């Protein structure tokens, strides 16, 4: 390799090793529509093989926020990639789109092949679960931009939906049911506050949070992927609107999927709140109302369906091994959201 480049702080050989290590993980995500392999200047996906009449492409990009800091500080890198995938594919899923392919971007102080492999393993796990091809990516070594051991991770997802099946919430009417799908925990938002509360509490992350997991396990639990269960519902039931509950909780996300003059009336007694949120609320002395303005509180994704389809929807979701509840209904109104039972 170039001695000049090495003296400038870039280890090309480490980059080559990282690519070799990640290749087997990437290959298990491939779909038949992907043309060519790794190493090209651009990745190619053959849309014609989808046999869609009038496909719309839906794209999304996101990162994992300061949840990364917890992963880095505790040298646990194998699940944070799932979060990157979930944040992107869950977003584009709200339009009814099936995720097709994904690209990742990793920027780091120094390429450590073993760490890069673990990150990409997580990305590949998320892609494999959602039938999304990890079609390309970039790993950038930038020693002067990041402190030792640090990295950032972002993702980019593209999906497709038939034009006639595109979901934008515009046809939502009063009196329809809102179905909430359980979250796996905190997901990937609010971690600046979470990390502050961890530090403030004085706990050791290796301590047990409950009988099943440590505090670290609870805080780093990957964001749930909703692609398979939601597409299973969409295949047989008309969905009028969908929401991925991320930063801003219920207050900021649920109204985004509803037309003017329609609001969501949510009864928070209709679903359980995971214990991790109770712990955060107690540590921060945070009001319940504010908690719903920050976190997902146990519901990571919502669907709006007709009332006569509630039972069928819940049955399909149960068959997909995900707990779901009728958490509310759409009503006339101009306020962003109505929460009862808080």
UniProtKB/Swiss-Prot annotation:
It catalyses: 2-formamido-N(1)-(5-O-phospho-beta-D-ribosyl)acetamidine + ATP = 5-amino-1-(5-phospho-beta-D-ribosyl)imidazole + ADP + phosphate + H(+). It is an enzyme of class 6 (ligase). Gene3D superfamilies: PurM-like C-terminal domain, PurM-like, N-terminal domain. Its EC number is 6.3.3.1. It is found in: Cytoplasm. GO terms for biological process: 'de novo' IMP biosynthetic process; adenine biosynthetic process. The keyword Ligase applies. GO terms for cellular component: cytosol. Keywords: ATP-binding, Cytoplasm, Ligase, Nucleotide-binding, Purine biosynthesis. InterPro entries: PurM-like_C_dom, PurM-like_C_sf, PurM-like_N, PurM-like_N_sf, PurM_cligase. Pathway: Purine metabolism; IMP biosynthesis via de novo pathway; 5-amino-1-(5-phospho-D-ribosyl)imidazole from N(2)-formyl-N(1)-(5-phospho-D-ribosyl)glycinamide: step 2/2. CDD domains: PurM (cd02196). One of its GO terms (molecular function) is phosphoribosylamine-glycine ligase activity. Belongs to the AIR synthase family. PANTHER family: TRIFUNCTIONAL PURINE BIOSYNTHETIC PROTEIN ADENOSINE-3, TRIFUNCTIONAL PURINE BIOSYNTHETIC PROTEIN ADENOSINE-3-RELATED. This is Phosphoribosylformylglycinamidine cyclo-ligase.
